[in-house]
């Protein structure tokens, strides 16, 4: 009987794989070693087994080349197994024909490191990327061509523009040639364009250009928003979706305007109506692709779940960290089978002496908002300089580990029950009533219901599944609930952090704090002993810990007091305009000094600046290296960019009547300040990153 069941399962799986090959018009799915990666209407199939992977975005050209390997390892420690990255055209070809693929722009080296670290990679090719980059990543010389030739239209199926896109795709492919999945490399997919209305033949032309260039990969994608103009040919490009906890792009200066709260409910609609609302109409963000209701449907994947968010000048969003878990819980409960985060790791824009490399209202393209010139921290789980935002990092990691161990089963389970706060998929129950700002006391969790395992049935739990180690099932407590597991009709109340029997099952419920130290590495559950994060290095386990330096201190001297604050003007897009360089002549100026004598490596040293004001900038020998729009959080600066140079911190005062959105906590700070404006420097600390290495006995 067992042989018959096994044969039947193999037959059904072979039909599924065959269907995937026939349904979607994608590239080579097998490596030279015979590993396969396929797509069907449910999800991804790796070596014949359905999986629910987790994708996280990092931009290599916004992170120092020397940090790539370590930061990729930290992303993997957080549960990321597919990395996505934009290839910003403007970063690589700022002048026509003059390409830069060196240093932080060395795409080939980044891809090789992904291969060496055994993580899959999706390349977002452009030509338009957005990413809060100047002109969305399209170089100025392209805009100049469009201005000189009315037949040359950007992001359109016009000969001149498509010729330049062909050069772009060919040049990108030359950098990754030999590193695709079919070559045994990490590149499993490419995204064509970004947030494009189409029409469809424009996207189809770009895909054909990519394929002709050599991008023969297991799948091709596009963003599933906005609604496309023209009928889509099914199976050419996977639409990937997103949702954000809040949006800097919104025009309104109020808490959670529009439909941001909808990101925190279960729903059967895939398209968010809250992404890029400054660009797209409500109608363009309200229609799912017609193909979704067709007999042959796409799997439900996301590429832009935003637990973090950038502050724009006019909208200073402060992410508290609790937003990420409810977002992914709601998507999984609604049937999604690939969480993809934007951003998972922040970064810093490359310096350009001619203009900012961040989005600005004054540019000819992507000009709806003013973003910082340099910082792109995004309040992500891993921040601009690699600092850990603990709540989203760990709460996301718990779910990602659960998906690693139970994702193959979850993927096979359809949505059986769906309401605003509750969903059930087979043996998994999803619950969320947390809503950013509107219901901060809410909770979010996933639990078992009638789950058959190890010869027993888990009837229900008040704890969340975390991981499996041999025959031991680890759970994590849900705060405020008694930790209980019902097995075969009997209820077991669990002691935290103690292994015990629950009927036929071996279980252990970790406290929330203990779980934050627990990492499953090579089939073992290891614990960080110093409050840091654990990741695997070449020959050992590394614990990374960040502390205030005990050997180096910064001294700050005020050299100029601020002048009266500027009157904040409105920009071209009718929202507040950020200050220009000339405005900083009115800033308070401080010099920052520190003694690093005897040190020859500064890569692990950072300044953490706590200030109050409008905008802060740090200059090294007169060159801008860091900036920050105040939203109540600290500013981070790499000391490697400062050592041996004259360091100046400039802070502009914040007018109380500035036409800028702040959340209630920041509003209270502003209103509590005496006078007409707020300005203060509370601390400048040197933070040191330590890496502690352990052998197998760890």
Role assignments for model-derived ranges:
Residues 150, 161-177, 183-191, 197-210, ...:
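Carbohydrate-binding surfaces of carbohydrate-active enzymes
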Residues 598-620, 628-629, 650:
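Aromatic-lined ligand-binding clefts that engage carbohydrates, nucleic acids, or primary amines
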Residues 20-82, 112, 671, 685-693:
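N-terminal carbohydrate-binding accessory modules
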Residues 86, 91, 95-98, 103, ...:
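Aromatic- and acidic-residue-enriched carbohydrate-binding clefts of CAZyme catalytic domains
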Residues 68-136, 207, 211-212:
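Aromatic-lined substrate-binding rim segments of carbohydrate-active enzymes
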Residues 140, 511-531, 538, 546-563, ...:
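Glycine/proline-rich low-complexity spacer/linker segments in large multi-domain proteins
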Residues 118, 130-280, 286-311, 336:
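Active-site region of glycoside hydrolase catalytic domains
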Residues 1-21:
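Bacterial Sec-dependent N-terminal signal peptides
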């Amino acid at each position: 009987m067992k042989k018959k069941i096994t044969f039947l399962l193999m037959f059904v799986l072979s039909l599924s794989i065959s269907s995937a090959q026939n349904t979607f018009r994608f590239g080579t799915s097998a490596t030279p070693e015979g590993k396969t990666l396929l797509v069907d209407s449910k999800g991804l199939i790796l070596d014949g087994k359905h999986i629910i992977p987790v994708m996280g975005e990092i931009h290599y050209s916004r992170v120092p080349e020397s940090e790539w390997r370590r930061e990729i390892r930290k992303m993997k420690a957080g549960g990321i197994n597919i990395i996505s990255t934009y290839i910003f055209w403007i970063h690589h070809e700022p002048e026509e024909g003059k390409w830069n693929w060196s240093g932080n722009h060395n795409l080939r080296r980044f891809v090789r490191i992904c291969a060496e670290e055994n993580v899959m990679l999706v390349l977002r090719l452009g030509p338009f990327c957005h990413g809060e980059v100047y002109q969305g990543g399209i170089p100025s010389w392209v805009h100049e061509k469009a201005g000189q030739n009315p037949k040359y239209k950007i992001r359109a199926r016009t000969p001149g523009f498509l010729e330049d896109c062909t050069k772009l795709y060919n040049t990108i492919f030359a950098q990754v040639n030999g590193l695709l999945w079919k070559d045994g490399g990490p590149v499993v997919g490419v995204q064509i364009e970004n947030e494009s209305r189409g029409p469809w033949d424009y996207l189809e032309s770009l895909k054909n250009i990519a394929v002709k260039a050599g991008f023969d990969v297991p799948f091709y994608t596009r963003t599933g928003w906005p609604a496309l103009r023209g009928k889509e040919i099914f199976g050419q490009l996977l639409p990937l979706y997103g949702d954000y906890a809040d949006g800097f792009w919104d025009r309104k200066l109020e808490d959670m305007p529009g439909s941001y709260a909808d990101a925190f409910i279960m729903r059967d609609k895939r398209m968010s109506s809250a992404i890029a609302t400054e660009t797209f109409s409500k109608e363009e963000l309200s229609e799912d692709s017609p193909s979704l209701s067709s007999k042959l449907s796409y799997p439900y994947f996301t590429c832009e779940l935003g637990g973090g968010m950038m502050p724009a000048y006019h909208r200073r969003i402060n992410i508290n960290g609790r937003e990420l878990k409810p977002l992914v819980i709601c998507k999984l409960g609604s049937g999604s089978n690939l969480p993809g985060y934007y951003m998972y790791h922040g970064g810093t824009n490359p310096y350009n002496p001619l203009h900012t490399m961040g989005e600005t209202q004054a540019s000819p393209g992507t000009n709806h908002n003013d973003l910082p010139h340099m910082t792109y921290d995004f309040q992500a789980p891993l921040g601009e300089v690699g600092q850990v935002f603990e709540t989203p990092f760990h709460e996301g990691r718990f779910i990602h580990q659960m998906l690693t161990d139970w994702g193959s089963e979850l993927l096979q389970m359809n949505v059986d029950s769906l309401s605003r706060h509750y969903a059930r998929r087979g043996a998994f129950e999803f619950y969320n009533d947390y809503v950013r700002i509107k219901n901060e006391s809410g909770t979010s969790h996933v639990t078992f219901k009638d789950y058959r395992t190890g010869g027993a049935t888990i009837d229900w739990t008040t704890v969340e599944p975390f991981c499996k180690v041999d025959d031991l099932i680890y759970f994590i407590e849900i705060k405020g609930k008694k930790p209980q597991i019902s097995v075969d009709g009997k209820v077991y109340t669990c002691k935290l952090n103690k292994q015990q029997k629950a009927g036929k099952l071996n279980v252990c419920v970790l406290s929330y704090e203990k779980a934050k130290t627990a990492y499953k590495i090579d089939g073992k559950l290891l614990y960080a002993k110093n409050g840091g994060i654990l990741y695997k290095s070449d020959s050992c386990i590394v614990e990374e810990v960040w502390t205030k330096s005990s050997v180096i201190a910064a001294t700050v001297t005020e050299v100029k007091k601020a002048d009266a604050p500027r009157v904040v003007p409105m920009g071209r897009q009718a929202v507040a305009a950020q200050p220009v360089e000339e405005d900083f002549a009115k800033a308070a100026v401080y010099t920052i000094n520190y003694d690093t004598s005897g040190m020859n490596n500064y890569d692990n040293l950072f300044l953490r600046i706590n200030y109050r004001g409008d905008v802060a900038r740090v200059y090294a020998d007169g060159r801008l290296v860091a900036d920050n729009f105040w939203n109540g959080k600290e500013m981070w600066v790499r000391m490697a960019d400062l050592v041996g140079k004259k360091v100046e911190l400039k802070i502009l005062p914040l007018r109380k009547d500035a036409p800028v959105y702040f959340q209630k906590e920041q509003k209270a700070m502003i209103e509590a300040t005496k006078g007409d404006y707020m300005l203060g420097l509370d601390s400048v600390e040197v933070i040191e990153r330590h890496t502690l290495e352990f052998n197998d006995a760890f």
